Design a protein with these regions (language model features):
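Hydrophobic membrane-insertion alpha-helices, especially the h-region
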Residues: 4-23
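Solvent-exposed, non-transmembrane regions of membrane-associated and secreted proteins
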Residues: 17-279
Length: 279
């Protein structure tokens, strides 16, 4: 009787091991497939002669990079930009009418465990709002915004002070001015402001919520900013937000575009806030 019991127990243990092994392999394949989709896109849109970016505190210019906008838009017209940020962030930015749409869809609009980097549905697609919100998952393997955790250290931020958003008209350079760890109910997700003075009040509130600030990069009430939002592992309603102010726009021929051009675009924007899900 005892022998039969242990034989049955051994069979059950073996079945459990096989089941969990299969589950682990299945999840591993999902992560690999998600990673591979973006790796292919990156290879297709990175010049062969591109070298390592020099992201130092005295440089607002990244190395030449120009995605194949014609091909990208032909495959998925929801693309509104491309973001690059040290150490590994290098992804297209999507936008849909519903923020849930790209939570678990890749660039090809099929299931991808990584989801997509995407601009909030309430924002203008040209990044002309005072505060544009860009979401991305915090993946354990470092994909998407998974390496943003490096920016919890102020020293790392000082060594890597910029991120870049590319649009069809050129390169938008943002300098990071604060990092915060907040709840998803924070005012950090406000995108529309009645006046520049209201935006200045918002900035003061962000200073109070920040884990740290970069004083010499702090924006004025006339600036435009981008907030990069990702979830914090094991803390369901907690978010990490990295905020950067726009400091330069350069077209693909190397000429600067006046920052005031964004103000004109924003005056023609009809975006209105809603209560979409946040990452």
């Amino acid at each position: 009787m005892i022998r039969k019991f242990f034989r049955l127990l051994s069979i059950l243990v073996l079945c459990a091991a096989l089941f969990f092994g299969y589950q682990t392999l299945e999840w591993s394949n999902k992560y690999k497939q998600g990673h591979d989709e973006y790796e292919k896109l990156q290879a297709q849109n990175t010049p062969e002669n591109e070298s390592t970016p020099e992201n130092d505190s005295d440089s607002t210019k990244e190395l030449p990079f120009c995605p194949d906008w014609t091909a990208l838009k032909a495959e998925n017209p929801d693309i509104v930009g491309w973001i690059r940020m040290d150490p590994t962030c290098d992804y297209p930015i999507m936008q849909a009418q519903d923020n849930d749409y790209y939570l678990y869809k890749g660039f090809g609009r099929s299931y991808n465990i990584n989801g997509s980097i995407f601009l909030s549905s309430v924002n203008s697609s040209d990044f002309s709002d005072k505060n544009s919100i860009v979401y991305g998952h915090n993946m354990r393997n470092g994909d998407m915004f998974g390496d943003n955790d490096y920016y919890y250290e102020k020293s790392y931020c000082l060594e890597h002070p910029y991120f870049w958003i590319y649009r069809e008209n050129g390169q938008y350079t943002y300098r990071i001015f604060d990092v915060m760890r907040v709840t998803d109910a924070t005012e950090a997700y406000d995108t529309q402001f009645a006046s520049d003075d209201d935006f200045e009040t918002y900035l003061n509130d962000m200073k109070n919520q920040s884990s740290y600030t970069i004083p010499d990069a702090w924006p004025s009430k006339t600036d435009h900013i981008v907030s990069l939002s990702t979830c914090v592992a094991a803390h369901g309603s907690t978010r990490m937000i990295i905020q950067g102010k726009l400091v330069n726009i350069t077209d693909y021929s190397g000429d600067d575009i006046p920052l005031t051009s964004l103000t004109t675009q924003n005056q023609n924007s009809n975006a209105t806030p809603d209560s979409s899900e946040q990452q």
